[in-house]
Design a protein with these regions (language model features):
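Non-catalytic linker/capping segments at the edges of enzyme domains
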Residues: 1-46
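Hydrophobic beta-strand-centered segment that forms part of the acyl-chain substrate-binding groove
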Residues: 66-77
Length: 77
C-alpha cells in the first residue's frame, strides 16, 4: 500500500496515530481507492474499552489521522 503517511517529512512523522516513525503508535495508513480514501485498521485486544469494542480515543485518532491524510492528499491530487 502506498500510504499518504509514507510521504510525510520526518519532522512531522511522529504522530501517535499515523506517524511511521512512532514505533509505539497506531501507524494508521490511508490510501486512494478510486476517488475515495480508505484506512483499514484492526484494533488489538489491548485497544478495547470492553470486549469487542474499540475505545473512544482510538476511534478519535482514526478519524483525525484519516481526515488529515485525506485533506493533505486531496490538496496535491
Amino acid at each position: 500500500m502506498n500510504a499518504f503517511q509514507d510521504h510525510y517529512p520526518e519532522n512531522v512523522a511522529h504522530c501517535y496515530g499515523c506517524g511511521r516513525l512512532n514505533k509505539y503508535g497506531h501507524q494508521i495508513r490511508t490510501e486512494w481507492d478510486g476517488d475515495e480514501t480508505v484506512t483499514r485498521y484492526t484494533p488489538q485486544p489491548y485497544e478495547t474499552s470492553v470486549p469487542g469494542f474499540a475505545y473512544g480515543g482510538l476511534i478519535a485518532s482514526l478519524i483525525d489521522c484519516h481526515s488529515t491524510g485525506t485533506a493533505a492528499a486531496a490538496m496535491y491530487r
